[in-house]
Amino acid sequence: FGNVAVCIHISGFNQICRYYGIPTYNADGYPGSKRPDYQSAYEKAFRAIFTGLSGGSSRPLHGGVYGELSHSPLQAVLDDDIAGMVGRYLEGMSVTDETMALDLIEQVGPVPGHFLGLAHTRKWWKQEQYIPKSSDTLTYPEWLQSGKKSCIDYARERMENIIATHKPMPLTERQEDDLERILDEARAHYQKTGQISSEEMSAYRASLASGR
């Protein structure tokens, strides 16, 4: 899955499909590694940047481990930083009169002038940067004082916090009605075409009624 030859193949595939206006689905998130580790990181990052640069339409990334055979919540948190960095890279550089800030350069002047105290610097630093959420960015003394944590440690803390505190937004009544209508249409279709028997449908409805 993480072989560089696959990246070359997918890049060519994406460009041909873009030429003909065909959407693509690239499997960025499926490394050969069996657990969250260095191999998983470089295989995923390498695939993600190349499929992004070559114009892939849909590029699933988060959580995949060992091809398409397993999923790890911890890996998903680590992958979120890969996705963020690749996304920021693909956004590119904004070159405008405001970002060039020639008037500020003239105003501040040469040494000992600096730009650190300017609102313009703070504004564009925040927009241009991507701050990873699970990376170790401390100085060496800070790293020692914090317990020598690795990216795996930070990702595990973030994962546990998300699991403990996340509250998904509930569906509206209209959304629930729409979903039920779509499911009813699908059930009717599969029964009509013989893909679901009456006995299977009865067992399915009984399971729904019991809440299992």
Please describe what each predicted stretch is.
Residues 74-212:
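Catalytic-core signal marking the mid-to-C-terminal active-site face
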